[in-house]
Amino acid sequence: MFNKSLYNHPWEITLMGVFNAATESDVAALELEKVSKKLPTAFERDDKFFANIKKRDADVISNRQMRVPIELRPGGSFQYFNADGGDLGRGGAPYFDKAVLNCVFVSQNIEYTKLNQWATDDSRKAIISSVRRYTATALDELRRQLDSQMMQAGNGVVGVVSVVATSGGVDTYDLGTDGFGARLVRYGQTIQVFDTTLATLRGSGVITFWDVENKQIKVTPAIAGAVAGDKLVVNGITSPTSLPAILGVPYHHSNASTGTWLGFSRSTTPEIRSNRVNAASAALSLPLPRLAINKIGNRVGIDENTRLTAWTHPAQAQAYEEIGQLVSIINKEPREQSLNMYFNDNMQLAGAPLRRSFNWDKTRIDFVNDGVWGRAEILPIGFYTTDGRKIFEIRGASGGVATADIFYMVAGLQTYVSNPAATAYIDTLAVPSGY
């Protein structure tokens, strides 16, 4: 028989000896482990602007330059004349020219070991098949990267270093200089570090820490000589100043009077410059969007600015909302009412529908004319294939097959704007607190 113990022990001393009570650790090997069937994603794959551009049918081209004809200048010779036998003189004609472009090629590379594949290839082993997940999301990730590329000026710059700290062979970069922070780069991405002039390559490394909220990344290995002001450039670009990347919004929406645009000299061809409104680091105010749209009308005519969409970061949408809140009136009715001091998504800036993208420069609002934006394509987005194969084995150091596979999502494309004068932008806007 067992006697009730006066002590809280997992054992009991009786006349018949010492008896031990089994504890949970004695049966841990029998317990089942519960794994949630849900697989949340702790990051985003936003591709809002690229998806908007991709809606249009692509111009399928070869590796030869694509030509985009433009009626660049009016012509003819206007005059008064003497109808009583006077000489009408000679005349002229409108002037036509062309913009030229070539496609560039990009890839998203996914590599995994065979053990990775075999350990998850059955529902009895894992909640999902890792390889199926990789193939299902690779296209989304490539589109996300392409959306980031739409935010750079053709030089491949995806970040500007504001602070450098090195410890244990790892560089920590704060990216607080521009309006993007760490938004245009991704964890696991190989990036190159160039000096501020984009003339000197300091080195390259892999992003092993990615903190979007605090605009900070860590790069392994540490890059010798990296300093504040250096620029992060996408891997595969050797000469950023030659503009070898996708030509994004800042390239086409620019009123710069130096450099080139699709073969034109910006200094001698003002017709191909976009329309700029400089906010001079001030907060968004109501006259700025109206001025931007009126600049378009001044260039291309009052009836040619009706297809505009205002693209911006949600930070500037908030700034616009706060302007509206200052002039809002709440009419209280004699019944219980809910309170919502915020506006819905149907905002407009001077008549242009407002579209938000977290990948956008926080200091800019771009008035995009969908009628003049285009996309050239030599290779549609998809798997890189050879003889029908989409997945390729990795080779080991001996020359034999390594227990790892790789596949590539690829694309060959370029963007163009057929009439930059029909676009406008507001830049150097103050960013609301908290962003």
Where are these regions (language model features)?
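Core alpha/beta structural scaffold of self-assembling particle/tube/pore-forming proteins
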Residues: F2-Q79, G92-Y435
